[in-house]
Amino acid sequence: LQWFCHPKEMEKWFEYWKGERMAWYKSIFTHPENLGFYQHEKLAHYAKKAFDIEYIASPIGNGKEMEGIHWRGDWDLSRHSEYSGQDLDYVDLETGEKFIPNIVETSGGVDRTFLFLMLDAYNEEDDRVVLKLNPKIAPYKAAVFPLLANKPELAKLARSIYDDLKINFMTAWDDRGNIGKRYYAQDEIGTPFCITVDFESLEDKKVTVRGRDSMKQERIAIDELAEYIKKHLE
């Protein structure tokens, strides 16, 4: 991203974008306390400031940078103007002031950010591996299981719930093996909620919702499921 502004407003906009970019990273990481700024001491001759957003808990030595935020001043447009012969000054229509816009540049890498998101979320516990992704970025928000796949009445109700939820959320379906293995399979891919339809569900119209991180189980009314998931994703 390149943000063009008045030279006198560079400080304001540099700090603005520095804050905005860090806030975005913190909004998607599981442990935002693992993020920080690195201020460059050696700068290009045209630069006044340069910061990197880093994953400070990285085990990769110096490979911590996810995004750079740079004060480029008027260097880019001045050089373009010099070599192209084009006047790239901006004229303020209200004041008539003429100036070369200054540039705040932010540049990030998707591959390294993805790597650090995985490192930040990965956990090995005594009896399971769990990817504790921020629910906002989990590939699936929920998974629906019939307690027993060979019971048509359970499968029918579970499939109905699955069809309803997938309208608004990325939802997985799994009826393989036993329920414990299904839970752990979803833990490994970071699914925040597992929803189990059991025999009680046929009577009380409620399902068991298991949270990925706490493994706590709650009974939630079927007609309240969508709102429950939405609330916990906010």
Kindly give the residue locations of the regions a language model identified:
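NTP/phosphate- and nucleic-acid-binding module
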Residues: 2-234
